[in-house]
């Protein structure tokens, strides 16, 4: 067991009840282009077309052979594009449950399936896009091989669901998914979970992680078990997608069910809700928010994104929906107040005298962007064997060669989310990291 001692357990109100409830009917789903880094789509459909669940919507010009499929049957309602015709979203009005049929196999024969057949079925169904690489956090090439595959069956994000609760309903499917993932690598499949969690392992190598966030991040797991580099690519996948892979091969259909943890200070009934991938959050959250000016976030409070407009749909890789109050109000002489109702990682506020207290946090950053001040905050929340202050400084200054030397290739935006949260300078380090990774990949 690996114990993580550096990090932060965010003391925020609105933790979800760990019981799964059925969500409302969803009439619109969407595939979001921003979820897939570097995507340049070749569209296979147009507005008004009828599609089946699992039918190809578009392929990627820059990653040939990767297919992105419909998350529901129905009619293509919108194809939204932004500046420079960047794909924002493909919206489907849900009608019926017609599905493309994929190859079906007995559970007992999965271990003997040909590796190329497994790969082809995942690509054709669109479930190949559930896999992501380190470095760069992109969908892997269809002919690539991973040095190892990490299954993240632990979640230490604030207000997250307990993976064991979700997996308990689909233990056989999860075990089958692990068996199939082993066909995609010559290395090991690592099942990362919390100590004592009742999660089937099949033939995967079980690794337990204990401690505070980011103990549940795949970046932490990869760093400790099989570090990624320019010469070694590892893949990772979420536990609910492993269940979907198992169901694809034993049932022959694409299962797009997704359990979300709805939580946050402004969530009316924080709990786990069964819905579907790409669900319209306008529909899913219609009766889930308290009155007032609130922001709905797809993903974690630390590194999720605002769900509004053409982006008001659940993210492909998100398993949480967070609701916060918009922090628009100015506080008179706020800097001079003792701060009994404010949280800080430093002992700047009176609230540090109540270490077990939970806070009704808002979207306010508590100030505008200013100079980066290294006062030890970053070292307190980064458990990786890196020099966080030097790495972050290099990202801000654009010294990408030095950033790579310090370990930037191992990281994803979520790995720096705590650094952003505790930063006195209010910098969003995730965006700087993405600029670095894009530049390194482009320039080789």
UniProtKB/Swiss-Prot annotation:
EC number: 7.2.1.1
A molecular-function term among this protein's GO annotations: oxidoreductase activity, acting on NAD(P)H, quinone or similar compound as acceptor
The reaction(s) this protein catalyses: a ubiquinone + n Na(+)(in) + NADH + H(+) = a ubiquinol + n Na(+)(out) + NAD(+)
Top-level taxon of origin: Bacteria
Keyword terms: Ion transport, NAD, Sodium, Sodium transport, Translocase, Transport, Ubiquinone
GO biological process: sodium ion transport
InterPro entries listed in its UniProt record: NqrA, NQRA_2nd, NqrA_C_domain, NQRA_N
Class in the EC hierarchy, top level: translocase
UniProt family annotation: Belongs to the NqrA family.
Oligomer and partners: Composed of six subunits; NqrA, NqrB, NqrC, NqrD, NqrE and NqrF.
Protein task: NQR complex catalyzes the reduction of ubiquinone-1 to ubiquinol by two successive reactions, coupled with the transport of Na(+) ions from the cytoplasm to the periplasm. NqrA to NqrE are probably involved in the second step, the conversion of ubisemiquinone to ubiquinol.
NCBIfam families: nqrA, PRK05352.1-2, PRK05352.1-5
Protein name: Na(+)-translocating NADH-quinone reductase subunit A
Origin species: Shewanella denitrificans (strain OS217 / ATCC BAA-1090 / DSM 15013)
